A protein has these predicted regions:
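Extracellular ligand-binding/catalytic regions of CAZymes and related secreted enzymes
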Residues: 33-38, 110, 136-138, 143-146, ...
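Short, solvent-exposed loop/turn elements at domain surfaces
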Residues: 48-52, 96-97, 147, 208-209, ...
Length: 263
């Protein structure tokens, strides 16, 4: 199944001589991270939206302690994740990202998180991080509800935040509006080998287009986080980077997922 969840990414580091069609070339930054900076790799290969988006970069500015670089599936298979603290898988197609990584690449991502790295999945990346498909990474103990109607539409939805979500996301209100683009509707996966996730936000309103049944989306998990081995995982079904009032959610998620820096 091809799961589309479009949003685009752009890296703050541009490498000379990199052509639009050279996704297999090295994209990893050669410069060392600033002291204390969280080193963030953004997946930039087949399955990620082609246009690229400044929004993820804008949410993670250097002056707030983030260092961003793109990474390809080939580099992941070559072990380049060792140079990073957190991996972000963005929107696009979760299944295509998985198949581009291949079995070996998916093993590297799982090992990276198991050993203490952080994983952030946004929309398609949340499909990838779930435990719902044969190609899923099985990092978050979550299954996708009503996957048949994944193309249920796009638009603004309301999220309901429980106390844990308000604390984790640094917001003092029960409800927040956020942009949604056909992300997964998540529910507990009941996988005994993966820790139960913590609900940070649930869908309070829904979009039910293109034949999707009404009454399914409300109450399912929109933002969830959990542990995998020594690492941490956060999955966003909607798009905090496309919602000005929610951009801080992504920063907080990356900080939480990143391994602690030594003193």
């Amino acid at each position: 199944m091809k799961l589309q969840c479009c949003f685009t990414i752009r890296c703050c580091i541009v490498l000379l001589g990199l052509g639009a069609g050279s996704a297999s070339r090295s994209l990893v930054a050669a410069e060392p991270a600033a002291p204390g900076a969280i080193r963030v790799a953004i997946y930039a290969d087949a399955g990620a939206s082609k246009k690229g988006s400044p929004r993820v970069q804008q949410c993670l500015p250097a002056e707030q302690g983030f260092q961003i670089a793109k990474i390809t599936a080939e580099e992941i298979r070559a072990g380049k994740l060792r140079d990073f603290d957190v991996l972000i898988h963005p929107g696009g197609s979760g299944s295509k990202q998985a198949h581009t990584l291949g079995l070996e690449g998916r093993k590297h991502v799982r090992q990276f998180v198991r050993n203490g790295g952080g994983f952030i999945g946004i929309c398609a990346g949340a499909y990838l991080g779930s435990a719902s498909y044969e190609w899923s990474l099985n990092l978050l103990d979550a299954r996708v509800v009503d996957s048949e109607h994944w193309a249920r539409g796009k638009g603004e939805v309301q999220l309901r935040l429980p106390p844990a979500g308000r604390t984790a996301l640094g917001i003092d209100q029960d409800f927040v509006a956020i942009h949604y683009e056909q992300g997964p509707l998540l529910a507990p996966g009941e996988n005994r080998d993966i820790a139960d996730y913590e609900l940070l936000a649930a869908f309070e309103t829904e979009i039910a287009e293109n034949g999707a049944p009404a009454g399914v989306m409300k109450g399912t998990a929109a933002i969830a986080r959990g542990a995998f081995g020594k690492g941490r995982v956060v999955c966003f079904s909607p798009h905090p980077e496309k919602t000005s009032a929610c951009e801080s959610f992504l920063r907080d998620a990356v900080r939480w997922a990143a391994p602690a820096k030594p003193d």
